Amino acid sequence: MIMVNLRIINFIGDIMKIRGICYRCGAEDELIDGLCPICYAQEHPLIEVPDRVEIEVCHMCGSYKRKIWQTPKSEEAFEILNEIAYYATKDAIKKKSVMVEVEIYPEVTQLPGGKRSKLIIPVHIVARGRLPGEKEDRTYEKDIEVHLRMVQCPRCSRFMSNYYEATLQVRAMNRYLTEEEREELDNFVREELAKRLKKDRMAFIAKFIPQKEGLDYQLGSVGAARNVAQRIKEKYGGKITETATLVGVDRDSGKELYRVTVSVRVPEYKVGDVVEYKDKYYLVTAITEDKVYMKSIDYKREKIGLAWHIAEKETKMAKKKDELDTATVIATTPTIMVMDDKSYEVYEFDNIGDVKIKEGDKVKIFKKEGVSYLVNKIEGKDKQ
């Protein structure tokens, strides 16, 4: 398609070329629209661009407005200004032919001073190529000025006015978050929002509200709240719920405006904990985004998987992993016998195929209402 277009351009150019006297300088040469090549080049630059270009730049975050507000690719001040001047110039240039290539050279020498400051960036432009009817490429150079108009972008304006579209609630099922979980989850939320900001300029925290139950974040973007909640669920497991509250009507469109609350509840328990489900006790063996996987600690060693909406309602914590008693194996045949490491009581269990142990191994045991259960063998980093 491009080759066809170039042939058409060259054909039109050949028609335009007639040898004669240039009406501008009087030289005899091949004429293009009545002008010799030199005069034609002077009358017809390769590009059109104004001497002064203006662009809006946010004095708070450094974003700049093209068709929409753009976040700079760099974090270094001079590189940001180079980027702004480059795109301001590029958007203002109108090429006169597809055979023209343009190079843009911003010349940043100073930094802006603040909200009401003015900054002018000189820019040198080099265009190379030719117009229809010209035999050879030529070069056209021009110096312009890019004027930065310091304003406050919509995002920062909303941020400064505590604007928010959604509340992200981080909770735990059937209990409060521990201090350790609060710190870990808060760091995770902030890291995920920092990543999200590169795609969603409204993914800022308008307000952080610690609650006794967990953590609340008022966010500038509903999408950010949903995205971070999903990332928490992917990493820790759990359940997400969403509600919306009518807060008003848009003046321009008449559409109803809602604030959304996205609640993510991480599991009550972790891998290695013992939980109760339908009057039986289970060892938590795996936690995924959608389910919790467990194994009964009786002689059957039944394996099951529960969706989180079921697990939240029908299971409860029986004993945390770190709170289980430990014991030492003193015999393995015909039954397994262990001695409690604290009370020195001896307990006897049936030999269970999926628990491969030998004398001297450390195991965890669970005691409830006079009944003892062999939970699992202590291995790896769990060894004391």
Swiss-Prot record:
GO cellular component, one term: cytoplasm
Molecular-function GO terms, alphabetical: ribosomal large subunit binding
InterPro entries: Nmd3, Nmd3_N
Protein name (database record): Uncharacterized protein MJ1650
Organism: Methanocaldococcus jannaschii (strain ATCC 43067 / DSM 2661 / JAL-1 / JCM 10045 / NBRC 100440) (Methanococcus jannaschii)
